[in-house]
Amino acid sequence: MVRWLDEIDLDPSDPPVRMGVRTLGDQSWLLQDDEEESQLALKAKLTKDESSEVFLALPESEAAGLEVCSLITGTGRQLIPDSKDLHPLKRAGLSVQEDLCLMRRDEGCWVLAAASLCFPSRWRLSEKIGREISDVHGPVTGYPEFLRKKVNSLMDRLSTTPVWRRNWFIHPDPSLYQPERPENGDPIIEAVHVHDELFLRRERQTLRRLHTARWI
């Protein structure tokens, strides 16, 4: 069994809505696997072909982006060469397999202020940039009732020591770049075709406060 599969709850019953946040401990916040070369190539292609859909940043996000670059090089990883007008978060995002998002504390709420997002699971960065976190998670079932206050509290309490969580989805499409949510829902897959027409998609998320004031 794939190692990460042991880390997610696959209870067939209706699971409780929860964040599932854990301490990262000695684990690295960045991972590398045998898909690194192909995924970095896909990121570069998406950045060229879908530029405004995979990277956006609000003004005054450069300092936080530079800190992310420092966090990456602090692990021994190398960044792609710098160039004129290259936002530091875009540079960081093109250097690692992970997508990278910056949240800023603004007027009592956390706002999505910048993101290098090449592998979205059915959401568009252009529709979420500049919006508070509860709006970003708007389509998530049970979020307003069960998670909104907990997520805001977690964000406020985050330290520079990272925590992590897992997400998982079942989609009829293995593509990493999936910005569209099916308007009429997913097609019904016959049981005999489930093994080759449905795909388990997982996300490993780490969260931390930056030293740059008011940023995560």
Residue spans of the language-model regions?
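Extended, well-ordered protein cores
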Residues: 1-216
